């Protein structure tokens, strides 16, 4: 079973941070940046979305937390008059948006988003919508296994710089340098 979780990247589901902290106290909770950006852009007019999104990118592409925070303040100041509420959640949630800055650039690129697991969840939801009743638990497990197996056939692109990512994560896991338990989860 899982012995430790280095990073949990999730959307803003209430209670997830506290639940994970209770079971795995050393886990870094990271709010999904892609979800944060999407939620922010809901407050922005269509004509300004591209420019606003580029400004947001400057925050999460910053080299360190201090620079990211300064860029967040700069983006807030720039757009405050036109979109006074757009950046409010960034400021309120900075503590769960900034943990990524503790990791290397390679690791950050992996943890920005939960899209990979969301894609798998989509496959599993489709299975559920096609067939809402299963004759037994075993039938359900077999269907889930086959759907997952089929989904993995599409996973042809390796993660960029995966060697460096695992190396960085191993260095973060001080108590067990020989095995890595790196989970990026969405709930």
Cite the ranges covered by each PLM segment.
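Short, basic/hydrophobic alpha-helical segments
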Residues: 1-7
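Acidic/histidine-rich catalytic cores and adjacent linkers
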Residues: 58-187
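Conserved beta-strand -> loop -> alpha-helix junction used to position metal-binding or nucleic-acid-contacting
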Residues: 7-13, 19-55
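A generic hydrophobic-helix recognition signal that picks specific residues
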Residues: 4, 28, 108-111
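Glycine-centered flexibility sites
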Residues: 1, 12-15, 118
């Amino acid at each position: 079973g899982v012995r430790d979780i280095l990073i949990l990247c999730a959307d803003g589901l209430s209670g997830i941070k506290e639940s994970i902290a209770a079971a795995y106290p050393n886990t870094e909770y990271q709010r999904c940046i892609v979800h944060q950006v999407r939620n922010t852009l809901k407050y922005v007019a269509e004509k300004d979305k591209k420019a606003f999104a580029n400004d947001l990118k400057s925050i999460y592409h910053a080299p360190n937390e201090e620079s990211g925070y300064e860029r967040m303040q700069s983006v807030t100041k720039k757009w405050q008059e036109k979109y006074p509420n757009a950046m409010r959640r960034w400021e309120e949630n900075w503590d769960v948006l900034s943990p990524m800055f503790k990791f290397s650039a390679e690791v950050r690129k992996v943890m920005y988003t939960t899209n990979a697991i969301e894609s798998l969840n989509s496959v599993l939801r489709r299975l559920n919508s096609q067939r809402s009743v299963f004759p037994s638990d075993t039938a359900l497990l077999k269907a889930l296994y086959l759907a997952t197996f089929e989904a993995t056939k599409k996973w042809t692109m390796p993660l960029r710089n995966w060697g460096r990512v695992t190396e960085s994560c191993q260095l973060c896991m001080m108590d067990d340098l020989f095995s890595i338990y790196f989970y990026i989860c969405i709930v």
